[in-house]
Regions:
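An N-terminal assembly and electron-transfer interface module characteristic of large anaerobic redox
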Residues: 1-423
């Protein structure tokens, strides 16, 4: 067992010795994205394991070690960690935990401390917790985001966004069930072999689009399209949203869910806006502007690759930002900030009027930028059909799915009325 080393504040560090022998567990948020991230870290000498466990036992473990008023994503991720450590599959003396930390004003920035508190409560204080962030928070001698590693991680996010975008547009129409998921597996292996090359991105993206366009499919013009927005973990995570995307597809829908690139551009953008409004943190302004510019460039590459095909690509960030200005200030940055409202407007402009706004119960930012904006959106866009769905330990899956089914019933009724009017 590696020697336990603590910093001056008493935080257990992840050391270079631990890097050689410890398994690092990370909770799953975006299935495609995190599979690619797992591959990258393993290629760079880490032993990373992506947790994909589900079930009520995860919630129960979370409730044992986290206050039930804490954010639902925190409860789930901590429950998933504790469940894995108790499973016997991992040596608790040779296991570390990793959590993505934004460093923003959302309570998600405190998840790291809640994880440590839970570990102490269940007698596993010897397990180090690593913060994965770009805000220079909690440095560890055994974990370094080197330029090469960071470049691969960033490019992998862009590849994963493209894979998710195409998969959502192909899977509901595929002739042979499972073809789309097999193609994702194929491209996961290919991208790993390419080391998630940035220089080959343009060429590779075009090939990915070509491969997805060749999946045998049957058009279904009457298929209902449903957009999914909300708090970042609940929106994407199958554990957090009770497999919402799969449920919608089982109900005969095509799901549209915005990619992670928009959120990363938004993170850079709000630092730029903050500096322009308050004239502070000029160094952060320069860095944020560079991050924003890079991801906007990558988004444009995806739009260009998808352009000639039958698929539709993401809306350019600046266009979405301009559309949301009459509704909410660009200075509204907590949680998903104005971006969540912009995503709903963007979907409606694309003709996707049916939207599920998924959020943890009691998530203050989402009550403002999600639920709080629905009335105004309905007034401006009467055709919009938006349903907010809360997720928490006491919410039953049946009630959530029944509310979504009611929204889908309204969507089918609107479709039939439109058909009748067009005849």
């Amino acid at each position: 067992m590696a020697e336990l080393v603590y910093n001056e504040q008493g935080r257990l560090l992840f050391t270079e010795e631990m890097r050689k022998e410890y398994t690092i567990l990370i909770p799953n948020m975006l299935p495609i994205h995190f599979r690619l991230l797992e591959r990258i870290f393993n290629n760079h000498g880490y032993k990373m394991k992506l947790l994909t466990s589900t079930g009520r036992k995860i919630v129960d473990e979370g409730l044992r070690y986290v206050h039930n008023d804490t954010c639902y994503p925190a409860l789930l991720t901590i429950g998933q960690f504790i469940d894995a450590l108790k499973s016997g599959e991992y040596d608790v003396n040779k296991t570390a935990l990793m959590m993505v930390q934004s460093g923003g004003g959302c309570r998600a920035s405190n998840y790291i401390h809640l994880i440590r508190k839970a570990l102490k409560k269940c007698g596993m204080e010897q397990v180090p917790v690593i913060s994965l962030n770009l805000a220079s928070l909690e440095k560890n001698p055994g974990f370094h985001l080197t330029p090469a590693l960071l470049a691969e991680l960033i490019t992998a996010v862009c590849y994963a966004d493209l894979l998710m975008l195409l998969a959502n547009q192909v899977r509901p129409y595929e002739n042979n069930k499972g073809d789309t998921d097999k193609l994702i597996d194929v491209w996961t292996d290919k991208l790993t072999e390419l080391n998630f090359s940035y220089t080959a991105f343009d060429k590779t993206a075009v090939q990915i689009v070509k491969d997805f366009s060749e999946v045998p499919f049957t058009p279904a013009p009457d298929k209902i399209k449903v957009g999914v927005v909300g708090e970042i973990y609940i929106k994407y995570s199958p554990l957090g949203n009770n497999d919402l995307h799969k449920f919608l597809e089982s109900e005969g829908c095509e799901v549209y869910c915005p990619g992670l690139i928009d959120f990363l551009i938004f993170m850079g953008d709000h630092h730029v806006v903050e500096t322009e409004l308050y004239h502070v943190k000029y160094k952060k302004y320069i860095a944020s502007k560079a991050v924003k510019g890079f991801f906007k460039m990558m988004q444009n590459k995806i739009i260009k690759a998808v352009g000639p095909s039958r698929f539709f690509g993401p809306t350019p960030f600046e266009e979405a930002k301009k559309d949301v200005e009459p509704f909410i200030s660009p200075a509204n940055k907590m949680g998903e900030g104005w971006l969540l409202t912009a995503e709903m407007i963007d979907m409606i402009n694309m003709g996707i009027n049916n939207i599920v706004c998924a959020q943890p119960f009691g998530c203050l930012p989402n009550h403002i930028i999600g639920k709080g904006m629905i009335r105004k959106l309905r007034e401006t866009y009467p055709q919009s059909n938006i349903v907010p769905i809360d997720y928490d330990p006491g919410a039953t899956r049946v009630n959530q799915e029944n509310r979504i089914k009611l929204m889908l019933s309204t969507a089918r009724q609107q479709m039939n009325e439109k058909k009748a009017a067009d005849q």
